[in-house]
Amino acid sequence: MRLLAGWLCLSLASVWLARRMWTLRSPLSRSLYVNMTSGPGGPAAAAGGGKDTHQWYVCNREKLCESLQSVFVQSYLDQGTQIFLNNSIEKSGWLFIQLYHSFVSSVFSLFMSRTSINGLLGRGSMFVFSPDQFQRLLRINPDWKTHRLLDLGAGDGEVTKIMSPHFEEIYATELSETMIWQLQKKKYRVLGINEWQNTGFQYDVISCLNLLDRCDQPLTLLKDIRSVLEPTQGRVILALVLPFHPYVENVGGKWEKPSEILEIKGQNWEEQVNSLPEVFRKAGFVVEAFTRLPYLCEGDMYNDYYVLDDAVFVLRPV
């Protein structure tokens, strides 16, 4: 037992020391690490670090249908987004931390999903919008406040934290036990997957951020959201990665097609956006505003950060 305790203390001390002394900013150390871990089965290259950030926000309005042209909100790289990027770049350079994460992920992926592993390690935080971008999209001021927020599929709660100053009560749902643990540490009220629809009260804002392409019944989910949203002033803020590639993650990192398929058509971002108002109409919503934003994730030893193209909508019930 003493030997085990000593080994654990030594491991923790090594991690702490590595965090302070080692980074992958050095070309030599990064090359050494990649050579140690790369191979035919290594991860594919991501978009982090090399893409012109201006392109993350570009929308060709001429390709949008008329009803969407008038509600498009142009977004830009702002201070809140830049802070997230800077922090992610710094974390990706912690050599021994990244080695430790890689080892744990390899072992735990045999019986845990990638999402749960990230929750256990406290890594892989997502970024959808900054406080300023959230306020501009909802057309609210920094002091605006209402009663209840429900964040569906909240992950580790970092995006929830950006919205939380505007709400008196904050509810969240999450499948991953380790992510639920992260949410509870932030003092959010976690509801069960089949509980949030049956609480007996309504929500003023419901966020559904990058969830529709990762759930088994996305249209049913939209209709359930409509049924518990405050019917006059309630709003939904919904983010969706485009191009649309739906799949459901199971234990062990296996992927399956969802049982409900949304009719999203088109080959590029604008074309797929044009097909979404009809999807929302079937669930009882109309688009009040939307924008294009990068969906960012903290990086690792391979990339400073990861990025996908998001369409973020504000929906009102009809």
UniProtKB/Swiss-Prot annotation:
CDD domains: AdoMet_MTases. Residues 1-18 form the signal peptide. GO terms for molecular function: protein-L-histidine N-pros-methyltransferase activity. Glycans are attached at residue 35. It is found in: Endoplasmic reticulum; Mitochondrion. Expressed in liver, colon, small intestine, skin, kidney and to a lesser extent in spleen, lung, thymus and stomach. Not detected in fibroblast and endothelial cells. Its main location: endoplasmic reticulum. The keyword Cell inner membrane does not apply. Changing residue 155 to R: Abolished protein-histidine N-methyltransferase activity. Keywords: Endoplasmic reticulum, Glycoprotein, Methyltransferase, Mitochondrion, Signal, Transferase. Changing residue 175 to A: Reduced protein-histidine N-methyltransferase activity. Belongs to the METTL9 family. This is Protein-L-histidine N-pros-methyltransferase.
